[in-house]
């Protein structure tokens, strides 16, 4: 009987440890982000009033709720008609410790409304090696000239 109890206790402890490890692997990262387009290229569609395609490199700085800072390098493309339409791009957030998160983002801009987009995390390095997950970002009203302010959030799972 005591061997059975010891085995049950050992299996219970192992299951609890595995469950705690799985929970510890999911992280929610909230941040504020300032971004600026670098050398944007715009093309107006001939014979389509208000149709503009934009392609640009961009850079930003993210300030995370936990006090960390990350540099954001990304590419961005949009296809707007009179200020509304789809956009997408690819971002890499580089943290001071060398870890990084790379994500694809996409959304639909509506003229006169704040930006909203969704992230799909596609990879990571360092503390985020093998990361997968999702996220979102929302424009914030501001008085910056030539830059944008956003609130963002990642929900990340690491192996």
Protein language model regions, located:
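Beta-strand-enriched cores of mature, soluble protein domains
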Residues: 23-159
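Bacterial N-terminal signal peptides
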Residues: 9-18
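Bacterial N-terminal signal peptides that target proteins for export
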Residues: 1-9
């Amino acid at each position: 009987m005591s061997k059975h109890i010891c085995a049950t206790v050992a299996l219970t402890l192992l299951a609890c440890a595995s469950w705690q490890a799985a929970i510890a692997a999911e992280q929610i990262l909230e941040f504020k982000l300032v971004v600026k387009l670098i050398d944007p290229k715009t093309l107006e569609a001939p014979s389509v009033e208000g149709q503009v395609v934009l392609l640009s490199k961009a850079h930003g700085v993210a300030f995370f709720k936990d006090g960390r800072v990350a540099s954001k390098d990304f590419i961005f493309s949009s296809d707007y008609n009179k200020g509304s339409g789809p956009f997408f791009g690819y971002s890499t957030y580089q943290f001071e410790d060398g870890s990084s998160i790379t994500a694809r983002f996409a959304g639909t801009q509506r003229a006169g409304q704040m930006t909203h987009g969704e992230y799909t995390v596609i990879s990571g390095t360092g503390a985020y090696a093998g990361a997968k997950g999702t996220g979102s970002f929302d424009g914030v009203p501001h008085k910056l000239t030539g830059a944008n302010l956003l609130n963002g959030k990642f929900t990340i799972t690491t192996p």
